[in-house]
Amino acid sequence: MLTEKQIKFYKENGYLLVENALPSKILKGLQDVTDEFVEASRNVAENDETYDLSDDHSKENPRLRRLKQPHLLHKTYEDVTLDECILGPVSQLLGNNLRRDHTK
């Protein structure tokens, strides 16, 4: 959980960096799933409903700029948005009335 000093910093500056906010197991899961999407993007030549590709993307050198709505593409992304390691600090800063509209 956040300290009073962190909450004060957020209120004064509008942002907060929380070191090691994600447990290593969750971070590793996100990295593995993202690597799978990067690998799959080798077979995609242009932006589509899933992939936003970099201009220099190629089959030989896949360059994935972002996944569109990742929480709908894989349960790992969905799960992290609902995990207490994210929701706990966010609710401390913004309150409990939270809603996810979309993701990038």
Which residues does each predicted region cover?
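Non-heme Fe(II)-dependent double-stranded beta-helix
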Residues: 1-12, 19-104
